[in-house]
Amino acid sequence: MSEELLNTTVEQEYDASQIQVLEGLEAVRKRPGMYIGSTSASGLHHLVYEIVDNAIDEALAGYCTHITVTINPGDTITVTDNGRGIPVDIQAQTGRPALEVVYTVLHAGGKFGGGGYKVSGGLHGVGASVVNALSEWLTVEVHKEGKIYQMKFARGNITQEMRVIGNTDRHGTIVTFKPDPEMFDTLIYDYETLHTRMREQAFLNAGLRIEIADRRTEDGPSDSMCYEGGIREFVLWHNRHKTPLHEEVVYMAGVRRDAEAEVALQYHDGYNETIVSFANNIHTPEGGMHETGFKTALTRVLNAYGTKTGVIKTDADKVSGEDCREGLTAVISVKLTDAQFEGQTKAKLGNAYIRTLVDSIVNEQLSTYFEEHPAVARTILEKAMTANRAREAARKARELSLIHISEPTRPRLIS
């Protein structure tokens, strides 16, 4: 077996000649997985998300109301927004146009100083340049102050300096790119994958219209999404094939310390738990502090209400967190100025104070909601207590089964 193991021994002397300095965007092309997670289909689609995230940052800042994503023939992508347009004036530190800096320098953008954006979802400020580095070619057009500015790149290198190509009465940014076949295992975009992500973003940004179209065929699918109800409608969408236990979606929101949180929830008659969380519009599939705060407060509020109304009489009657979340559909969305994600792909939110914020909002507002809607509160509490009883019954059954298995079998006497 030992012959099959990788030999990790290095014979060469370890000196300065082994130290590589990667200039510009070389680091991205050398280790793309560090920036987009993988070079599989997931990473391919991540390129689109990064450009869209930049457009959504404009929406969060209050300047963008419409985003369009187009899959073109040949699986190139065009993302159009009606935001302010990427700055085109000279950036002081580099002496180069800001547009060039955004697309050619890692960790460059309007997200670091706090002046350009209060909150943002882009990939730690490296999204545009990473997409550029991993594209066979990329063209960006900026409509700003009556002029159309254009710049072109190939694999992160400038092929056309920024220049004015016309006049316009619009404002915003248009980015078109072709993923580099040298970088990715697949180059075929899946419409449904992109559609799901765009629908998600439309729910999270109430009133923002996002359109997506597949132009690879004449009759390709398209959709236009705008949800004035925001995450309330997101919860209803998740429960569209379920039977809700209460008609109204419970909605809670609040602001503390330059951070805001909103939570929407509704219970159904099923048994599965669905909690979908986001930070600055970025899905956090592994949860994080915002989910922890929500779960803790939900359990506390239900037990407090049950105790206050006499439904919960002893500690043994108290419901666990798992009991409280049976049949629950919830969407949690937080926006904060200094989001700390664990990992470049933002799977988990790490800001500790967000836990306190979400806990406080849910504790206060859900308690008030239960006081004002006792019928809904009783329905939810009864479901949790039913789950508790079922869990206890299952535990006792397992214990009896273990006792039965552990009992020695007595030999029978044969007369």
Show the residue positions of the predicted features:
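GHKL-family ATPase ATP-binding module
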Residues: 2-15, 25, 49, 57-59, ...
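Residue-level signature of the cytosolic catalytic core of signaling kinases
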Residues: 17, 40, 91-95, 227
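Mature N-terminal segment immediately following signal peptide/propeptide cleavage
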Residues: 17-30
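Alpha-helical membrane and juxtamembrane elements of multi-pass inner-membrane transport
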Residues: 19-22, 42-45, 100
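Conserved short strand/loop->alpha-helix "switch" segment adjacent to the catalytic nucleotide/phosphoryl-transfer site
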Residues: 30-49
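Short conserved segment of the HATPase_c
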Residues: 86-109
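Hydrophobic alpha-helical segments, chiefly the membrane-spanning helices
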Residues: 414-415
